[in-house]
């Protein structure tokens, strides 16, 4: 079996259906003895350019290990789902389980934002 990195972009009006879509795509991979090594829901983000007059979309990243038939079935599901604006499948040499740069950036942003809000609270208490 080969390793793949799969990213798909979902129309923002269909964001509430993303968890069900993820489960459906996971089922396609695991039904053929494939594995999901990493699954990241990046949420709604600004796109670099509009697709179908939409400027924001819901992004999902999956690192999977599967055979060609499962991959073909997955791509077929992407093509015939109107909510999926774009999808990209890239073959990788090995399984990737570490957090993606997008998630690392988001985590560091949340860590730096949290202490700043904590520091602001004592300053307000001192001025009161």
UniProtKB/Swiss-Prot annotation:
* Keyword rRNA-binding on entry: yes
Keywords from the UniProt entry: Ribonucleoprotein, Ribosomal protein, RNA-binding, rRNA-binding
Cross-referenced Gene3D superfamilies: 3.30.70.60
What GO annotations for molecular function exist for this entry? Answer: small ribosomal subunit rRNA binding; structural constituent of ribosome
Q: Is RNA-binding set as a keyword in this record? A: yes
Q: Cite the record's Basic and acidic residues compositional bias ranges.
A: 118-128
One annotated GO biological process: translation
Q: Region labeled Disordered — which residues?
A: 97-128
The record's Pfam families line, in alphabetical order, gives: Ribosomal_S6
The protein's superkingdom reads: Bacteria
Q: InterPro entries from the xrefs?
A: Ribosomal_bS6 (IPR000529), Ribosomal_bS6_sf (IPR035980), Ribosomal_S6_plastid/chlpt (IPR020814), Transl_elong_EF1B/ribsomal_bS6 (IPR014717)
Q: What would be one Gene Ontology cellular-component term for the protein?
A: cytosolic small ribosomal subunit
What the entry lists under HAMAP family is as follows: Ribosomal_bS6 (MF_00360)
- Similarity section: Belongs to the bacterial ribosomal protein bS6 family.
Q: In UniProt terms, what function does this protein have?
A: Binds together with bS18 to 16S ribosomal RNA.
Name of the protein: Small ribosomal subunit protein bS6
Q: Which organism is it from?
A: Aromatoleum aromaticum (strain DSM 19018 / LMG 30748 / EbN1) (Azoarcus sp. (strain EbN1))
């Amino acid at each position: 079996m080969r390793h793949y990195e799969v990213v798909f972009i979902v129309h923002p009006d269909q964001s509430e259906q993303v968890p069900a879509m993820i489960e459906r795509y996971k089922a396609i991979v695991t039904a053929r003895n494939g594995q999901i090594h990493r699954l990241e829901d990046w949420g709604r983000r600004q796109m670099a350019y509009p697709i179908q007059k939409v400027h924001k979309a819901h992004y999902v990243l999956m690192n999977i290990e599967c055979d060609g038939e499962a991959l073909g079935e997955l791509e077929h599901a992407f093509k015939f789902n109107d909510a999926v604006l774009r999808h990209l499948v890239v073959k990788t040499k090995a399984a990737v389980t570490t957090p993606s740069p997008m998630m690392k950036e988001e985590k560091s942003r949340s860590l730096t934002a949290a202490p700043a809000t904590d520091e602001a609270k004592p300053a307000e208490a001192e001025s009161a």
